[in-house]
Amino acid sequence: NLYIDIDFSQKRKYLHRICGDVFLYKKVKEDNSIICVLSDGLGSGVKANVLATMTASMAIQYALQQRDIKKTAEIIMKTLPTDSVRKISYATFTIIEINPDGICKIVEYDNPQVQIFRDKNPLFLEKSIIEGTINRKRKYKLLISNFELKQNDKLIFFSDGVSQSGMGCPGFPIGWGEKKVSDFISHLLSKFENLSARALCHEVVEHAVANWNYQTKDDITCA
């Protein structure tokens, strides 16, 4: 049996009291699967938190009803309110389902892509794309992937507050970037062999905060 270590780290936008990112996870008693959800509400503060909480909670509740996560994601897309000006959803999300047999299913919508490491090296998955339109106006694209987990595999996912950290600051004209985040994680895994989920997430978040010179311009979450 696989031992699964789940944790997260988070920092609010500078001078804000509430985080607009939400991470939830739950073990489904009926089939012993585990569902993890990270949602990033549009903007920051209370409104972003409410929308992200609604999105993550919906994903958890549908999982408890043993719904397929691909179907769950499509239902969420049809439920989420839309920004009337930008024609985009008010929240993004990543859903990960881990079954007792080690099969891991991932659905991603507009979040930075999940980073997977095996033997301390990045593992790149083939992803299928589901495209749809809601009310004949808003288009969306879901990335779907699945693979079999091996012992000591690492799955790291984060909000764009990580990948875009430092944007506009010296050395980060377009932010930290997903590739550099991946390189940083790979370095950590090589340096610290038995790094816990909490410690790994903490290191990523603290580095992202430092990229902003400790005055974060977005909510930051890593799980």
Model-derived segments and spans:
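Regulatory cytosolic signal-relay segments
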Residues: N1-G20
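A short alpha->loop->secondary-structure connector
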Residues: I116-E126, F172
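DG-centered beta-turn motif at the end of beta-strands
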Residues: D40-G41, N111, K154-V162, D219
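Primarily the active-site beta-strand->alpha-helix module of PP2C/PPM metal-dependent phosphatases
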Residues: V22-T79, I156, M167-F184
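Beta-strand-turn-beta hairpins that frame and shape the catalytic cleft
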Residues: L2-D5, K29-S33, N99-I103, K150-N152
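Acidic loop->beta-strand submotif enriched in PP2C/PPM serine/threonine phosphatases
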Residues: R17-D31, E126-M167
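Catalytic core of PPM/PP2C metal-dependent serine/threonine phosphatase domains
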Residues: N49-K120, L142-I144, N194-A223
